[in-house]
Amino acid sequence: MADPGPASFSTRANALLRKNLTYQKRNLWSNIRLIMIPFYLCILLVIIQILFDTQVNNSADNRCGCECIERNRAGKCQRELCGLEHSKPDQAFFCSIPRPPLWPPLLQIPRPESRDVRGLRDDSCRRTGSCPVTILFTGNNRSLGTTVSENLFTSSVSANASEILRTLANNVLGTTVEADFTNYLDPGIASNLSIYNIQPRCILNATFPFSFEQPPLKFEKELRCVQGSNLWTNTSKEVNDKIFKGYKKGNPEGKINEIAAAYDLLNTDRNNFNVHIWYNSTYKDDAGNRLIKLIRVPRSVNLVSNAYLQFLQGPGTRMLFEYVKEMPKPETSLRLDIASLIGPLFFTWVILLLFPVILSSLVYEKQQHLRIIMKMHGLGDGPYWMISYAYFLTISVLYVICLMIFGSAIGLKFFRLNSYSIQFVFYFLYLNLQIALAFLVSSVFSKVKTSTVASYIYVFGSGLLGLFLLNFLIEDSSFPRGWIIVMELYPGFSLYRGLYELAQFAFRGNLRGEDGMKWKDFGDSAMDDVFYIIVVEWFLALIAAYYIDKISSSGRNPLFFLQNPFKKSPSLRRPSLQRQGSKVSVDMEKPDVTHESKKVERLMLESSTSHAIVCDNLKKVYPGRDGNPPKLAVRGLSLAVPSGECFGMLGPNGAGKTSFINMMTGLLKPTSGTALVQGLDICNDMDRVYTSMGVCPQHDLLWETLTGREHLLFYGRLKNLKGADLNQAVEESLKSVNLFHGGVADKPAGKYSGGMKRRLSVAISLIGNPKVVYMDEPSTGLDPASRKNLWTVIKRAKQNTAIILTTHSMEEAEFLCDRLGIFVDGGLQCIGNPKELKGRYGGSYVFTMTTSSEHEQNVEKLIKDVSPNAKKIYHIAGTQKFELPKEEVRISEVFQAVEKAKSNFTVFAWGLADTTLEDVFIKVVRNGQAFNVFS
């Protein structure tokens, strides 16, 4: 098959996308259960809503007031009459009101004990309730302002019972009772407290009784005179200062000095009327899930307008503000949307539940080393990030769309009343932030269980903290708004705040029979701040996640982005000069290793690519920890492997083989030295190296739910195989490792035996004809027949490929490897083909004999007679092994000596063997360890 060349960005992205879709297809029921979570929650909210409506609407306090007009003998009411006249102020809202009452316009004034007394001699007026009502004035023209302020109040208190509203309108009436959220019943009139008549001058405790009737309602009220005090201030800043310091927390003494109202006449003159009005907005009581109360601002506007008209036209001119009136209404019931009341908590949990799913998926690929194995087979960071991000975003968007559709379908006002476009934009922005955070946080965790526990703590903790902490502080008008914004920097709180705002608008809209949040309301809520916070955090989290991923996955310097991208590495095409004296002295004892090193130096100076792998003085030192010295894992390795050669690495555990493979595959950064793979430097061009590389790791890195065929299709696409070539390569690979017949190819890898998984890992490493393949103990766990078959596959694959494999099987090394290198303590002790090594280190026969213990001396005498220079190498329980130099023995003489010995003592077993590769390995390892200890 022709070389397909490196895969493009789109090809690799397509491969990952197909793999992800197949993977999710295998996990279909898990995805369905995930999507059903919002369905279950919405149904739960509907059930709670039904139970709530049934319970609440049966309460007498939540319906129009009634009076019993007929009782039976037992005293039980048989007939009742309901209406506004029988209702308490709280019940009036529920009554049918075809002709709403007319109410005199009242000015909101402070309670007597809270009025401003800073300009008085003392505060004794508070004990008698006679403190004046203070109103502040300012503007550009003090003379005009003084005249206007003098026209503010009247002295008329005459009453005409036939025209009571007009009579009251000619006076400036005030009340200390806050308004309700409707004007069907004015609490200022309905309460038992006095109505105040604000006049320029008052007789102490002067009162005027009057009767106010609006059928079917009738009230006997008392009009109490109170003095109005108009004070001039030079600037609006002084007005703000006086108002703020009159607030209990605005002065160190904690005193209350409330101002009723304030006016800034600005540039008002005879041709221009321009005024700013201050009022106490806390009377709106707009914190929490309740309707905003009305505030008595209209009378303030009318007063200053009348005062200006009288300034222009004289005291006989005025705009009479006769009454305020609500719109007619039918009888209503209490409409409380439970989804809006508890929705912020529930929907915070619903949306955040995606976070553990995304995080677990990312950490799983990290824990199982699937991310790095994909990267080793050519999947770069760009396609991985783009497809993974787009995939998670698609799943998340479908999730919230299902939530919105189902919530709307079952009638939840939270979704129906608020603008769908606002909801979608809010969810979309937050989902992007949540995905970016998952990528960022995934770099912290290495275990799925740990990440899952931590993420669910985050999910439920965020919802509960939002309900009991953030919700409380939002509704606390004294808590600084700036600190609320700071708290919303925590992503869980920004989500909760956005849902809180949507819930508030839906709740009020449901009570009023209006819409919830629309784009025109955007500036009147905290949603603009939430949007800004989410967008900025999304951008920052995405950059931070990508940056940390680059550092952690490639071992780059944290300041890698400051390096000159056009600066060539000094290691390219130049041999390393970091040769230590100890290395030179060792190489003098190993001519084969020295020859390899010189060969590497020559290749580094040439432009030839005949050798697929060239390692130049590659070294890895692990830093010391806990007081231990640094660990030298690889001691300046120089090695050249041409295309078409299989190079085997032998060595005891801890010799440095794995560290070397990890450096070559990009898992570790070399401490010094470098290596070229197809002419590309592993220190600077690892992403390009991956496109021509195959890896069979020591442990099988597979997706348990994907089949063997799907694994090979994925990795084949990463190697730029397409169409018929891809299918042919996959089938050939499956057949070569005996995973094709009997439907095995289409079984999930999780159902494979250990040997089948191993064969699949080898097939993955070889698909697409990579130029370089690293195999770490490829035949581990295979039965003899499968092992022989696998060796044949590897031997056939090496024709156009450079293969480096590690193994503990001498048989495997001898069958597969063209050359062998034996590693001891991080250094290469010898290098050559198996026959050369056996010839070089195996100039002796191995004689073995087993007898009873009392005849051990006889065996030693026998060997000394045959070979005076023989050396005992093994002795245990009557079994002894000797090395016999080939130059001083003949095989026939050994046989004759043994036959003669059998007549003198009993021989249980004996044998004579030529030197094996295992004997060479043991000898080299022992010599190498002894030399390193001596050094």
Curated annotation (Swiss-Prot):
Classification via SUPFAM superfamilies: P-loop containing nucleoside triphosphate hydrolases
Q: Which Pfam families match?
A: ABC2_membrane_3, ABC_tran, ABCA12_C
The UniProt record lists the keyword Lipid metabolism: no
Q: Quote the InterPro entries the UniProt record gives.
A: AAA+_ATPase, ABC2_TM, ABC_transporter-like_ATP-bd, ABC_transporter-like_CS, ABCA, P-loop_NTPase
Any idea where the ABC transporter domain is?
Answer: 613-850
Gene Ontology cellular component list: membrane; plasmodesma
**GO molecular function terms here?**
ABC-type transporter activity; ATP binding; ATP hydrolysis activity
Give the way it sits in the membrane: Multi-pass membrane protein
Please tell me where ATP binds in this chain.
Answer: 651-658
Q: Can you say where in the cell this protein is located?
A: Membrane
Which region ranges are annotated with the description Disordered? 571-591
Q: Which residues cross the membrane?
A: 34-54, 338-358, 392-412, 424-444, 454-474, 483-503, 528-548
Keywords, comma-separated and alphabetical: ATP-binding, Membrane, Nucleotide-binding, Transmembrane, Transmembrane helix, Transport
Q: Which family does it belong to?
A: Belongs to the ABC transporter superfamily. ABCA family. CPR flippase (TC 3.A.1.211) subfamily.
Q: What is this protein called?
A: ABC transporter A family member 7
Origin species = Arabidopsis thaliana (Mouse-ear cress)
Taxonomy-wise, where does this protein's organism fall, top ranks first?
Answer: Eukaryota, Viridiplantae, Streptophyta, Embryophyta, Tracheophyta
Gene coding for it: ABCA7
